[in-house]
Design a protein with these regions (language model features):
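N-terminal secretory/targeting leader peptides
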Residues: 2-142, 159-369
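A gly/proline- and charged-residue-enriched helix-loop-helix capping module
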Residues: 140-156
Length: 369
């Protein structure tokens, strides 16, 4: 570590000297946001027309954060735009089946959707890396990578290929590892189970021998009640409590190996996005930024109360034995290598995030207690 830092400092000094003394060297006068991804904007001289959109949500409106953020965003938009941007919230399945939401937004069948990109792994493997990353970064570093180190550019490229413009419109923190109807003491206890899971969590659970089922959030409790699944890997304690998973599974495990941070996406039909004025686009971006700020604080603030309620209801809350967590990490590394070898987009996103985390870890080791 010290040797590395010494070399890093020396390299920076030499680089600065060479840059200053090189012939024709110039100091860039580019604005601070140069190089940042900029969405294709409509002609700002266009006459603004009132916007009235329908939004289909993958999450129930009463679900803490994941769902309620949709209503919060809609209220913000109406207030900021003085009523000129109106979005009508529709509960999961009301307009289209939740797992068909991607196609519905891409085609313009619905104007916008609220979901997690981990649902869209069959569209592109790389989408799953924006939803939840196994053994991944916390919220702060995940946002740092996304906003300032290439993540947003890759994210927008993926969505734009599919005629969707997407904005991060909320964040979630660490998830639980899973709910099960019996204790999990050994890795073999996970094998042959049927687990409701999506994204990369599902791929890792399948790698170790479990079977997974991709369910819309609103369908998870019914599947658990009918014993169609033996376990559930979903989200944060607050969201899990809302689904009432404790009624049919009494063993809740941590840590959240498959999600330390998650993004909630506002997907907008790209043609309709480009038809907005620059001012209207900025209004939507501003509302989503405010949503992110709110969800970051409120999400962390609400988790202990949710855990307390879960324990009161008789759930056994504990951590996986370290050997299980280690086995899951090894499985993830193998899954990641396989996915990266098979898919260029997955490889680009994974390498971008990996390179950032390697550099960021030096700052973490030096600066954080």
């Amino acid at each position: 570590m010290r040797g590395f830092i010494g070399g890093l400092v020396m390299g920076l000094v030499i680089g600065v000297v060479l840059a200053v003394t090189a012939p024709g060297s110039k100091i860039s006068s580019s604005p601070g946001n140069a190089g940042q991804p900029v969405a294709k904007l409509a002609n700002s001289n266009n006459i603004e027309k009132p916007v009235k959109w329908k939004l289909a949500s993958a999450f129930p409106s009463e679900m803490p954060l994941s769902g309620s953020l949709g209503l919060t965003m809609i209220d913000r938009l109406k207030e900021i735009s003085s009523g000129k941007i109106e979005v009508e919230f529709h509960e999961p399945g009301a307009l289209v089946p939740t797992l068909d939401l991607f196609e519905a937004v891409a085609s313009g069948t619905v104007d916008a959707g609220l979901a997690s990109s981990q649902f869209w792994g069959e569209k592109s493997a790389a989408f799953e890396l924006f939803g939840a990353v196994p053994f991944g970064p916390d919220i702060a570093s995940h946002l740092a990578w996304f906003r300032h180190h290439g993540g947003q550019k890759l994210y927008e490229e993926l969505y734009h290929r599919n005629n969707i413009h997407s904005l991060i419109c909320g964040v979630t923190g660490a998830a639980g590892a899973g709910w099960f109807d019996h204790p999990i003491k050994e890795l073999k206890d996970l094998k042959d189970l049927k687990i409701a899971a999506t994204g990369l969590a599902a791929r890792v659970y399948r790698y170790i021998g479990a079977t997974t089922v991709n369910l819309a959030p609103a369908d998870i409790l019914a599947a658990l009640k009918k014993k169609q699944v033996d376990g559930v890997a979903f989200s944060t304690p607050a969201a899990d409590e809302f689904l009432k998973l404790n009624e049919y599974a009494k063993h809740y495990y941590f840590p959240g190996w498959f999600q330390q941070a998650g993004f909630i996406d506002l997907m907008i039909n790209l043609t309709k996005w480009e038809g907005l004025s620059k001012s209207q686009q900025k209004t939507i971006e501003t509302a989503c930024m405010a949503n992110m700020d709110y969800s970051l604080a409120a999400g962390e603030a609400g988790q202990f109360d949710a855990l307390k309620n879960i324990v009161i209801r008789g759930v056994d809350v504990k951590k996986f034995p370290p050997k299980i967590t280690l086995a899951l990490k090894r499985a993830w590394l193998k899954v990641a290598r396989t996915r990266a070898s098979a898919n260029k987009d997955f490889r680009r996103v994974l390498n971008s995030l990996k390179n950032f985390r390697e550099d960021y870890s030096i700052w973490q080791e030096l600066g954080k207690i």
